[in-house]
A protein has these predicted regions:
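Long, contiguous binding/interaction regions
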Residues: 1-39, 44-155
């Protein structure tokens, strides 16, 4: 997680740092904090702990970076969530009831109901997302839009 000054080009410089070092960004989510001059960036990469530490040190050298916090520290607690929107084909009332029952079981929300489909919203950690995908795959040709991971530390 990185907090940066809200200025033009900052996100490009941050992502460029990862690209120049050969890391593929798995997930990138940005958003304004309660202070409009500061942006929060959550970046997920596949890397060793040592590589993450190196990337954090590189990020800290960037002028616009206010602070960097990395997953992996023993005494660092944080909450992270992902979100899915799933369009599920639904051509009968029975199938719609089955979808609603799965939603209730997984604590999903119905985001929209159309003539031939149901849109389901799922949010949670990776295990919740995986369980929802497996549960709704039985309905055939689902369409999935997956957000990146957002996170915040406990302190």
């Amino acid at each position: 997680m990185v907090k940066v000054a809200n200025r033009p080009g900052v996100l490009s410089r941050i992502t460029g740092l990862f690209t120049r070092r050969g890391y593929n960004i798995e997930s990138l989510v940005t958003g304004m904090t309660q202070d409009p001059s500061i942006y929060h960036i959550t970046v997920a990469v596949i890397a060793t702990d040592d590589e993450v530490e190196l990337l954090a040190r590189q990020l800290e050298r960037c002028m616009e970076v206010i602070c960097v916090k990395c997953d992996g520290g023993e005494d660092w607690e944080f909450v992270q969530k992902e979100m899915l929107l799933i369009r599920i084909p639904c051509d009968s009332p029975e199938k719609r009831v089955e979808i609603m029952n799965i939603c209730a079981l997984l604590s999903c929300k119905t985001a929209g109901v159309g003539k031939n489909s149901v849109i389901v919203e799922v949010s949670g950690d990776t295990s919740v997302i995986t369980a929802a995908l497996r549960s709704f795959e039985i309905f055939g040709d689902i369409e999935v839009i997956h957000s990146g991971t957002v996170g915040i530390d406990m302190y």
